[in-house]
């Protein structure tokens, strides 16, 4: 997988497009293939260390995104591989894949593209 990685929270010009191992979802998580992500003002603040949420470095920014479930972790029974979901998690959206807690996901209709 690839992701915009923040290793130094000094702004977007320091983000690096980085190849990373594809993660495995843990208990209560799904692995999401990101299909679309938005760029919001909090995303800009987070990568400058100016937001109230300060993720541990390094991290993949991107707070709002949508994608397709690729794998489900233990304890996740209401989401299935191939299902389309929207996510609001705070981080992870600026990568091709991300593990995310099922509590941050909402399924959306297949007619939405």
Predicted regions and their residues:
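Extreme N-terminal starter segment of soluble prokaryotic enzymes
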Residues: 1-2
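Short beta-strand-to-turn element immediately C-terminal to the catalytic PLP-Schiff-base lysine
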Residues: 6, 47, 70-71, 99-101
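Short gly/ser/thr-rich secondary-structure transition/capping motifs
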Residues: 12-17, 50-51
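Glycine-rich beta-strand-centered segment in the early N-terminal region that forms part
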Residues: 21-38, 50-92
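Cytochrome P450 core scaffold surrounding the K-helix E-X-X-R motif
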Residues: 42-44
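A structural motif shared across PLP-dependent enzymes of the aminotransferase-like
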Residues: 89-101
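Conserved small/polar residues in nucleotide/adenosyl-binding loops
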Residues: 103-110
């Amino acid at each position: 997988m690839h992701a915009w990685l923040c290793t130094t929270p000094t702004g977007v010009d320091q983000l690096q497009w980085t190849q990373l191992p594809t993660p495995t979802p843990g208990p209560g998580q799904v692995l999401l293939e990101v299909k679309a992500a938005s760029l919001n003002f909090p995303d800009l603040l987070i990568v400058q260390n100016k937001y109230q949420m300060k993720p541990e470095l390094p991290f993949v920014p991107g707070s709002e995104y949508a994608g397709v479930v690729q794998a489900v972790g233990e304890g996740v029974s209401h989401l299935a591989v191939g299902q389309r979901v929207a996510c609001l998690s705070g981080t992870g959206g600026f990568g091709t894949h991300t593990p995310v807690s099922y509590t941050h996901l909402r399924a959306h209709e297949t007619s939405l593209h």
